[in-house]
Each structure stands twice: as C-alpha cells, then as structure tokens.
Amino acid sequence: MSSSLLTDLVNLDLSESTDKVIAEYIWVGGTGMDVRSKARTLSGPVDDPSKLPKWNFDGSSTGQATGDDSEVILHPQAIFRDPFRKGKNILVMCDCYAPNGEPIPTNNRYNAARIFSHPDVKAEEPWYGIEQEYTLLQKHINWPLGWPLGGYPGPQGPYYCAAGADKSYGRDIVDAHYKACLFAGINISGINAEVMPGQWEFQIGPVVGVSAGDHVWVARYILERITEIAGVVVSFDPKPIPGDWNGAGAHTNYSTKSMRSNGGYEVIKKAIKKLGMRHREHIAAYGDGNERRLTGRHETADINNFVWGVANRGASVRVGRDTEKDGKGYFEDRRPASNMDPYLVTAMIAETTILWEPSHGHGHGQSNGK
C-alpha cells in the first residue's frame, strides 16, 4: 500500500459520510505509569463524559486483574478533542473499577476526586501548574536523542532553552505535542528544552482540582502517540542517565484562594510547614526511583531533608520572589519525580495543606478528609 494512500486514509474526514464518531478510551495501566487505550464507535458526537457508555478491558493483560476474573470496568471521566483523528472524534480519560463498582487499587483518581470534592477543599479552589520533564531516547538503544552512540555529549550548559542542531534534539516532536495538546483542549501553558540534552519539559496549568491529573495524563498519552509516530521513545525516568546530568522532575506549583488573597504569604508559610511535617509520606508517593534524582545536586534538595526557601532551586519547596514581594501567590513543590501520578500528588498536597491537622507537632496527625 503506497504511503500517500495510507496517509490519505488516516486523514479521511468522516463527517462527509457518517455521523458516527470514534472515541479513544484512555486509562492508566498496572505499573501506574503505562498509559493504555482502545477505541470504539459512537453513534454521534458526545461532549459530556456522563453520557458516554462504560466499557471494560482484560485487566489480566495490564497487571490489574487475575486471569480467572479479568474484567475491569472503565468509567469515562473527561473528554478531549482527538488531535490524531480530528473532526468530532474524541479522547476519553477513564478510571478503573472492579465489576462490583469498587475502584481497583491502581485507581488514584477515585481518591483524588474524593479529596477535591471535600467542602473545605472546594472552597479553596486549589490551582495547580505541573512542569512535566521527560527525556527522548533513540529507539532500540535507549540512549538520549542527539547523543553519540555509546558516548556522551559535551557537559551541561549550552542546552537549556537552546537552538541549533548541535544543542537541540527533538524540537519537531515537542512542537507537534504542544499544538496537539492545544487542539485537544488541554491547558498546556508552555514548553522548553531542559538542562540535559535530549530532555524537554511541558507545563500544564493552571488547572483546578482533579482536572489537573486528567490534563497531565492525556498530555502524556498524546506525547506517547507522537513519539510512536516519530520512532522515538519517551522516558519519564527521574534519572535516565547516571552521573553529572540533571534528573527529570514534575515540579508542582500550587495555590489556594487564601494564598492568592491578601495575607496569603502567611497561609503559604503554614502550608509549607505542614508539608515539612509529612515529608516522608509525600516522598513515598512522589514517584519511583526519586532517590536517584533527589541527591542535593543538579538543582535538587536531598531526599532525606526538607528545606524551603525563596528563589532557591536547591530547596524541596521554593517560593518565588514575586510571591514574597506581593505577600500572596503560590509555591512550588520541587520534590515530585517525572514519573509521579498527578492524581496522587495533587490530592496529597491539597489534603496535607487544607485538611490535615498535626497532632502534638508530629508528622502523624489526622486528616479531616475521611
């Protein structure tokens, strides 16, 4: 089949011949980092997730169920436009349930939605901005794009936000992803080349509550699809190359209504104090392999210490100069790894800063979110 005919068929506009649309159902797989999807035909356009049919998949093939009881049910939660099929076709972010209606253990969205629907959390309108770093790897050899085979490029310095064939690798993928996310209706706010060559970042936000997780996951899915087309592998490993190279994080910027209002800086300081008290619990939920990244070098704080500061990129939590000057604003949690689950991280930050109350100054207080 000629490639031009294939391209024509892939780009067929269905609206001329049928009202039917294609819905690509997306879910998080058993590793907590793999994105799975499959498509089905709908009789016409749908823009409300509650009007979409539930569906199922073989959970024994994704590490989410056993072979003798393998059915997992998909509940549609958020709809985005499909940048690949275009037209009225859609991407659908789903979460996963057992046939009895209970959320399965890997369904972090369920608990996040519960925390974000708590009246105290809702009243605070938590905003998130997530900086998703990732590394582009050459297929088959798992070595960063633009790096010599079995060798290393020159040391870090020239690559961050750089242009030029000797410094910037994979920009076509990054730009395709940026535009595809905007087309999809994802609140992507920017992109940049990172400190390590072959590493890039996109930013999602500001997005309120559980939607932040939906936007990050669908943006990751779109990136996986684009790199698939380009024949490149995307890695969310927090430290893909050992040694004197920057790791990959998912810095999470956060503010509540109280923090954005006059006197907000005091609220921010109290929230950061609470985060420090629960440092260990947060680190446990902030991504696998993070200890390889949070070493106290390469713009990170040591994983065992909680430090915060104004404009300090070697801190666990950073407050911007503007926030300090204005007496209100937001802060940045720099601890989450690039492979973190945004549902888990965003909900945990809201729970600790809004619902959790320390008991006698120790890190094991109660949350009012039960």
UniProtKB/Swiss-Prot annotation:
<feature type="region of interest" description="Disordered">
    <location>
        <begin position="41"/>
        <end position="68"/>
    </location>
</feature>
<keyword id="KW-0436">Ligase</keyword>
<dbReference type="GO" id="GO:0005524">
    <property type="term" value="F:ATP binding"/>
</dbReference>
<keyword id="KW-0547">Nucleotide-binding</keyword>
<dbReference type="InterPro" id="IPR036651">
    <property type="entry name" value="Gln_synt_N_sf"/>
</dbReference>
<feature type="domain" description="GS catalytic">
    <location>
        <begin position="108"/>
        <end position="370"/>
    </location>
</feature>
<keyword id="KW-0535">Nitrogen fixation</keyword>
<dbReference type="Pfam" id="PF03951">
    <property type="entry name" value="Gln-synt_N"/>
</dbReference>
<dbReference type="InterPro" id="IPR027302">
    <property type="entry name" value="Gln_synth_N_conserv_site"/>
</dbReference>
<keyword id="KW-0963">Cytoplasm</keyword>
<dbReference type="GO" id="GO:0006542">
    <property type="term" value="P:glutamine biosynthetic process"/>
</dbReference>
<dbReference type="InterPro" id="IPR014746">
    <property type="entry name" value="Gln_synth/guanido_kin_cat_dom"/>
</dbReference>
<dbReference type="InterPro" id="IPR027303">
    <property type="entry name" value="Gln_synth_gly_rich_site"/>
</dbReference>
<comment type="subunit">
    <text>Homooctamer.</text>
</comment>
<comment type="similarity">
    <text>Belongs to the glutamine synthetase family.</text>
</comment>
<protein>
    <recommendedName>
        <fullName>Glutamine synthetase cytosolic isozyme 1-3</fullName>
        <ecNumber>6.3.1.2</ecNumber>
    </recommendedName>
</protein>
<feature type="domain" description="GS beta-grasp">
    <location>
        <begin position="21"/>
        <end position="101"/>
    </location>
</feature>
<dbReference type="InterPro" id="IPR008146">
    <property type="entry name" value="Gln_synth_cat_dom"/>
</dbReference>
<dbReference type="Pfam" id="PF00120">
    <property type="entry name" value="Gln-synt_C"/>
</dbReference>
<dbReference type="InterPro" id="IPR050292">
    <property type="entry name" value="Glutamine_Synthetase"/>
</dbReference>
<comment type="function">
    <text>Glutamine synthetase involved in ammonium assimilation.</text>
</comment>
<keyword id="KW-0067">ATP-binding</keyword>
<dbReference type="InterPro" id="IPR008147">
    <property type="entry name" value="Gln_synt_N"/>
</dbReference>
<feature type="compositionally biased region" description="Polar residues">
    <location>
        <begin position="58"/>
        <end position="67"/>
    </location>
</feature>
<dbReference type="GO" id="GO:0004356">
    <property type="term" value="F:glutamine synthetase activity"/>
</dbReference>
<dbReference type="GO" id="GO:0005737">
    <property type="term" value="C:cytoplasm"/>
</dbReference>
